[in-house]
A protein has these predicted regions:
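Glycine-/small-residue-enriched transmembrane alpha-helix faces in small-molecule transporters
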Residues: 2-49, 92, 152-179, 200
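Juxtamembrane helix-entry segments on the extracytoplasmic side of multipass membrane proteins
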Residues: 13-18, 40-45, 49, 71-77, ...
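Hydrophobic transmembrane alpha-helices of multi-pass small-molecule transport proteins
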Residues: 59, 80-82, 112, 120, ...
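Transmembrane alpha-helical segments that form core, pore/gating elements
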Residues: 55, 59, 117-119, 123, ...
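Membrane-interface helix-cap regions at the ends of transmembrane helices
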Residues: 30, 34-37, 41, 55-72, ...
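Helix-helix packing/entry segments at the starts of transmembrane helices
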Residues: 49-50, 91, 105-112, 176-199, ...
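Juxtamembrane helix-loop-helix junctions in multi-pass membrane proteins
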Residues: 26-56, 102, 172-196, 210, ...
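Specific transmembrane alpha-helical segments of multi-pass solute transporters/efflux pumps
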Residues: 26-27, 31-32, 60-110, 146, ...
Length: 297
């Protein structure tokens, strides 16, 4: 049963797709700054399993309330890939990276996310894009890797490598999820992926939990709450609704705004420095992503 999940009153027409899509991107843009705050008091491993467990329990309730049909064996395998990418892989690797670099620095790598998603869509879907696609793909990656190498001499090569791996596995999860959503439904994909991971996340959460929660700051709790409720679940509801209302090709372009929004949040909320180099590389990556999307089919 593929139902529309209503957290807010739906907005009719193409405008609703753009509005819902923008809300989804705005929510995702706060993920890295919120993670940065949370890992001050929580370990990256506990933060990863805690956010997955909280979101997974909520997702299970939603699936039961809406009486969604269980996925078949093939879909379960695909959902496992989604879970490895966006439920475990990206959250864990990015949290580990943020122990070494600022959220503003890490957000530069998010500019590659649409590109890695497109690359895995090509590999998984067997598409044969225009040769210009690969030119933009290589150029965009060179911007980020080049900047990371230069900055890594004074920042942290470990953090850069972890963020690069995070973006790669997230791109795989996004591509597999987009492919699966055609048959399973949009919000149902992330919900089932969370539920599949739940039996592993909950026990692990108890094993790696802090020895005491008395010293945990309010900011860390807020960060955990944000990545659990918004980044892991609610953001996907708005995002997939926007894609359905306004079209994947059109509304999907809003993802290009995420690095700019993320840098703005890092600067205003965390008071992190956003250098001219960060902005330049982000703009360069976004232009390359836009070019790769144009020739991606």
């Amino acid at each position: 049963m593929n139902r529309e999940l209503s957290l807010t009153k739906p907005i009719a027409g193409n405008a609703g797709g753009w509005i819902n899509g923008f809300v989804g991107v705005l929510i995702f843009s706060g993920s890295l700054p919120a993670t940065r705050v949370a890992i001050i008091d929580f370990s990256p491993v506990f933060l990863t399993v805690a956010r997955a467990s909280i979101a997974g329990l909520l997702a299970l309730c939603l699936l039961l309330i809406y009486k969604e049909k269980r996925p078949n064996r093939q879909q379960v395998f695909q959902l496992a890939i989604v879970a490895m990418g966006v439920v475990v892989g990206y959250p864990l690797l990015s949290a580990l990276a943020l122990q070494y670099v600022t959220s503003a620095h890490s957000i530069i790598f998010v500019g590659m996310l649409p590109l890695t998603t497109a690359l895995f869509a090509v590999l998984r879907g067997g598409e044969r894009p225009h040769p210009a696609f690969w030119v933009f793909a290589i150029l965009g990656s060179s911007f980020v890797i080049g900047y990371a190498v230069v900055q890594g001499l004074s920042v942290s090569p470990i953090g850069d490598i972890l963020m690069l791996l995070a973006v790669i596995v997230c791109g795989l999860g996004y591509a597999e999820g987009a492919k699966l959503s055609k048959t399973l439904g949009g919000w149902q994909v992330i919900s089932w992926a969370l539920v599949i991971a739940l039996p592993f996340m909950v026990p692990l959460g108890f094993m790696v939990r802090p020895s005491s929660f008395t010293g945990i700051s309010t900011a860390a709790w807020v960060g955990l709450g944000y990545v659990s409720l918004f980044s892991m679940l609610i953001g996907f509801v708005f995002w997939y609704r926007g894609l359905a209302q306004g079209g994947i090709a059109a509304v999907g372009q809003l993802q290009l705004l995420q690095p700019f929004l993320g840098l703005a949040l890092a600067a205003t909320l965390l008071h992190e420095t956003v250098s001219l180099g960060m902005l330049s590389v982000t703009i360069g990556v976004i232009l390359c992503v836009a070019g790769s999307k144009k020739f991606g089919k």
